[in-house]
Structures are given as C-alpha cells and as structure tokens.
C-alpha cells in the first residue's frame, strides 16, 4: 500500500465537512450541564461514535457521574500527542432569556447555535472527527494520537483532566492539544490557572429601621473588601523571554478580535470576578452574615 500523505488526509477531511457540522450539532443537542445536569448521555454518544468508527475506547473514572473516555490510534512507540476536550457545559440558565433553544444545535448559513458550541463541543467534535478521518485514511503514524474526553471541566475538573494526570493516563505523552476556543487561526501556548475564593463576613443583626445606627451590616463590610479586589488586576505574571514574545502577539490579537484597547492585558495579569453573593434574610433586617465567591485567574509566575 502506498504511503498516505498529509495532503490526502486533509482532502479527505474537507470532503466530509458536512459530517463534522452534523457531529457538532448532535453533541449540542445532548444537554450536559455541569454541575446541574448529567454527563451519561453525552459520554455514551462519544463512545458509540468511536466504536462505529472502528476505534476501540475505554471509560475510566473515579466518579461514575463524571466519566472520561480514552482512545488511541497508531503505534505504542514514537511521538505521542494527546487530544484533550471536555463535553460538559455551563448551565443555560433561564431559557426564556435565550433567542433560541440553547440545546437545538440549529445550523444557520454561518453559525451553529447552542450552549457549549464553542466551549467546547465544536472542539470535541473536531477531535472525534480527526480520529475517524485518520483511521479511515489508512495513514501510518510514526507515533500515536491519544484522545482524552472528560466530562468534568466547568466545575473545576477534579474528576476530569486533573484526575487523569494524577493517575498516570497522560504518562509518556510528548504534547497535548486542548480544543478550547481561541482566536481564529491561532494556537495558544498555555492557560491561566484558576482559583475560587470564598469570602465570608460576620456582623450583628438589628431591625432594618435602625440601619446605620445599630447593628453591624455584614453585606456592607464584605462590600468594602470586594471593592479592593480590583487591586489584584495590577499583579502581572513573570515569563521567560520566549513566553513574553508569544504573549505580546496574543495581546495584539486579542485586542483586534475583541475591539477593546487594553483588553489584551488580561492575558498577562490576574483577573478577578465576583460571581456569587449571598447574604441577609429580609430587607427589614440588618444582615449578620454575607458570603461571596470570587473567580480568580492566575497567569504564569503568580502563585
């Protein structure tokens, strides 16, 4: 059999582009919200797709509610690349606020609509499709391509990629490509770290009619702290020269894509978002407790 070229594999993929579009749509139509939903249906879909493509796969997990799917094509030796993606999506929230069904997977002339389209069922579909095309092409790989599909990423990844790495499933890999959404035609070299802070304040309750004169308002106390969080965004990471060069280009691209001068600085600086606040029981009571959850993203070099 003659050697299959890279160009031939590419042309095969192009000829099946509509199959890829359908695959993205099919994945979107399976609700897989995290932490409010279930991952079983979408994981079973992934396993069936691989099986139908003639690619053996394995389900592994430490939590049956968040299973991972592993597959490999190619040789045991040689250069090894992991394709990593997650099938869970953030909750759709109030569906009445959507202009369309978030789980319709509707295909327009330019877009595929639905919750998790870019983050990251399109990426997962691309990986599944790539595995199938490589298999069907008969291309002989000089190494192997390993597929890691996880179902816990949006809520911290404890049962997803983190668990896979800690238990040796990524051992021996030379590189990993993660299908998270980035700017068109660009490859990012890393991701910021994530940190969730739970901030709590205690006060002293009193009747609301005495607010400002009696009691100690826990919400107001915590609000003063939250006002200071913007100071965190002044903290910048520390980089090697090669990383600094890549980050400079990424900043320029980000500002061009988003159209907001200065927004590219988020790549090299700490970011902080107050996502949830809970406090108080009634409007006519001075609250004695308040809690806020803050999402902090850390660049390279910030511990």
Regions found by a protein language model. Give the residues of each.
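Metal-dependent amide/peptide-bond hydrolase catalytic core
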Residues: 2-8, 32, 58, 196-303
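Acidic/His- and Gly-rich active-site-bordering loop/insert found
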Residues: 2-113, 136-141
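Catalytic metal-binding/acid-base residues of hydrolase active sites
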Residues: 33, 88, 154, 182, ...
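Hydrophobic/aromatic beta-strand patches that form the interior of the parallel beta-sheet core
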Residues: 58, 81-83, 148, 175-177, ...
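Short glycine-biased active-site loop of nucleotidyltransferases that positions the nucleotide triphosphate
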Residues: 72, 187-191, 284-285
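Fold-level recognition of mixed alpha/beta catalytic cores in primary-metabolism enzymes, strongest
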Residues: 112, 117, 122-233, 253, ...
């Amino acid at each position: 059999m003659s050697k299959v070229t890279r160009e031939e594999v590419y042309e095969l993929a192009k000829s099946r582009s509509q199959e890829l579009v359908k695959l993205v749509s099919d994945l979107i139509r399976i609700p897989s919200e995290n932490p409010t939903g279930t991952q079983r249906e979408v994981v079973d879909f992934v396993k069936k797709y691989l099986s139908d493509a003639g690619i053996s796969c394995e389900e592994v997990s430490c939590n049956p509610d968040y299973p991972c799917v592993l597959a490999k094509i190619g040789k045991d030796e040689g250069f090894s690349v992991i394709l990593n993606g997650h099938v869970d999506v953030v909750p759709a929230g109030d569906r009445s606020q959507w202009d369309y069904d978030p789980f319709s997977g509707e295909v327009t002339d330019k877009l595929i609509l639905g919750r998790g389209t870019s983050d990251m069922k399109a990426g997962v579909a691309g990986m599944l499709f790539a595995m199938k095309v490589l298999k069907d092409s008969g291309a002989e790989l000089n190494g192997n391509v390993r597929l890691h599909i996880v179902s816990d990423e949006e809520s911290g990844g404890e049962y997803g990629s983190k668990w896979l790495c800690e238990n040796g499933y990524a051992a021996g890999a030379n590189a990993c490509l993660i299908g998270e959404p980035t700017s068109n035609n660009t490859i990012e070299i890393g991701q910021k770290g994530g940190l969730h802070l739970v901030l709590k304040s205690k006060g002293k309750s009193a009747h609301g009619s005495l607010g400002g004169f009696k009691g100690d308002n826990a919400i107001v106390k915590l609000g003063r702290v939250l006002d200071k969080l913007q100071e965190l965004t002044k903290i910048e990471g520390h980089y090697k020269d090669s990383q600094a060069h890549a980050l400079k280009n990424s900043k320029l691209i980000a500002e061009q894509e988003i159209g907001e001068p200065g927004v590219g600085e988020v790549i090299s600086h700490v970011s902080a978002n107050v996502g949830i606040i809970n406090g108080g029981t009634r409007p006519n009571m001075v609250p004695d407790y308040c809690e806020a959850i803050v999402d902090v993203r850390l660049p390279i070099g910030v511990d």
